[in-house]
UniProtKB/Swiss-Prot annotation:
Positions annotated to bind DNA: 47, 70, 158, 231, 233
CDD domains in the cross-refs: H3TH_FEN1-Euk, PIN_FEN1
GO terms classed as biological process: apoptotic DNA fragmentation; base-excision repair; DNA repair; DNA replication; DNA replication, removal of RNA primer
Residue ranges, annotated region (Disordered): 358-382
Needed cofactors: Mg(2+)
Keywords in alphabetical order: DNA damage, DNA repair, DNA replication, Endonuclease, Exonuclease, Hydrolase, Magnesium, Metal-binding, Mitochondrion, Nuclease, Nucleus, Phosphoprotein
Source taxonomy: Eukaryota, Metazoa, Ecdysozoa, Nematoda, Chromadorea
InterPro entries: 5-3_exonuclease_C_sf, Flap_endonuc, HhH2, PIN-like_dom_sf, XPG-I_dom, XPG/Rad2, XPG_CS, XPG_DNA_repair_N
Highest taxon of the lineage: Eukaryota
UniProt cross-references to SMART domains, sorted A to Z: HhH2, XPGI, XPGN
UniProt PTM comment: Phosphorylated. Phosphorylation upon DNA damage induces relocalization to the nuclear plasma.
Name of the protein this chain belongs to: Flap endonuclease 1
Length: 382
């Protein structure tokens, strides 16, 4: 889940903290990728005929093709990836995992009903909700990345927390994930939609934690308490407190303890035995491998090893895989040259816009269209 509604809270209260960009804007950067999240995205992506990519034995292989293609695309854009895999979930996540199991049971029931009705679209929707990355798929992804020469980090606990600490230590530029709690763990930069399919033309959203804290006038500790109030994976939240109220309460009272002392708990009841202090501590001091102990080395791909795995074992088309590996080799060489060119000032200038700037431009365009139609643009209701 991450942090419920955090992206919108930042958009509303700290719009300059969000930039909209293309992948080429991150040329020369190294990024830490939440591997479980990207594997999930590859698995829920279906082909035009509505099916997943499979081997002759009927095994799903979408995760492997997705991993290969996205990795090659990153190198083609001068981006060096590091994949970080989840370890064991923290004990505090038990409640969230139970809720997910309940939602899976509900989705299974809804899927059966949709199939009985012959509702294909509804059936596809619930099938996606039932997708879960298996240990075998994780292991296969690690094997492929190893053969491709891409560094893999196995986090002792949450991948987002490990990514965040690699960012804070300066080992990588930002965290690639859809889960906003990477910011709560302290990642100074979070990149959403980084691995979205090219065909969908979804721009990358870059969230800057320092700018968000500065514009919202919050300390790191206050921001963490705000995230707990919004809703996280580790504990419940105060009933009746939505995003606007949460921001208001944190700005006024600075921390959850003082909020609890001052709010009407009959109107805004907190959870019984609310473990918000443990959640706060988990965000401040998560279980991670120390960044200085993490070695990041990119090696030449074992071409024949990849061919044996993907084509010999998983029935991929050999010509297609060799073409992808040739692109990988070429882009890694050109990427090195590109970084040298960039150092001497010959790099291509890439423009980026903040989400706020983009929104203002869209509003101005709407206003122009309204004027052309013969009347002043309508004011938005406050």
């Amino acid at each position: 889940m991450g942090i419920k509604g955090l992206s919108q809270v930042i958009a509303d209260n700290a719009p300059s903290a969000i930039k909209v960009n293309e992948m080429k804007a991150f040329f020369g950067r190294t990024v830490a990728i939440d591997a479980s999240m990207c594997l999930y995205q590859f698995l829920i992506a279906v082909r035009q005929d509505g099916s997943q990519l499979q081997s002759e034995d009927g095994e799903t292989t979408s995760h492997l093709m997705g991993m290969l293609n996205r990795t090659v695309r990153m190198f083609e854009n001068g981006v060096k990836p590091v994949y970080v895999f989840d370890g064991k979930p923290p004990d505090m996540k038990g409640g969230e995992l139970e809720k997910r199991s309940e939602r899976r049971a509900e989705a299974e029931k809804a899927l059966t009903e949709a199939k009985e009705k012959g509702d294909v679209k509804e059936a596809e929707k619930f099938e996606r909700r039932l997708v879960k990355v298996t240990k075998q798929q994780n292991d296969e992804a690690k094997r492929l990345l190893g053969l491709m020469g891409i560094p893999v980090v196995e986090a002792p606990c949450e991948a987002e927390a490990q990514c965040a600490h690699l960012v804070k230590a300066g080992k990588v530029f930002g965290t690639v994930t859809e889960d906003m709690d990477a910011l709560t763990f302290g990642s100074t930069v979070l990149l959403r939609h980084f691995l979205a399919p090219v065909a969908k033309k979804i721009p990358i959203k870059e969230f800057n934690l320092s700018l968000a804290l500065e514009e919202m006038k919050l300390s790191v500790e206050e921001f963490i308490d705000l995230c707990i109030l919004l809703g996280c994976d580790y504990c419940g939240t105060i009933r009746g407190v939505g995003p606007k109220k949460a921001v208001e309460l944190i700005r006024q009272h600075k921390n959850i303890e003082t909020i609890l002392e001052n709010i009407d708990q009959n109107k805004y009841p907190p959870p019984e035995d609310w473990p918000y202090k443990r959640a706060r501590e988990l965000f401040l001091n998560p279980e991670v491998t120390k960044p200085e102990e993490v070695e990041l080395t990119w090696k030449e791909a074992d071409v024949e090893g990849v061919i044996q795995f993907l084509c010999g074992e998983k029935n991929f088309n050999e010509e297609r895989i060799r073409n992808a590996l040739a692109k990988l080799k070429t882009s890694r060489k050109s990427g090195t040259q590109g970084r040298i060119d960039s150092f001497f000032g010959n790099s291509t200038k890439v423009t980026c816009v903040t989400a706020a700037t983009k929104r203002k431009a869209e509003e101005a365009e709407k206003a122009k269209k309204g004027a052309k139609k013969g009347g002043p643009p309508k004011k938005r209701a406050k």
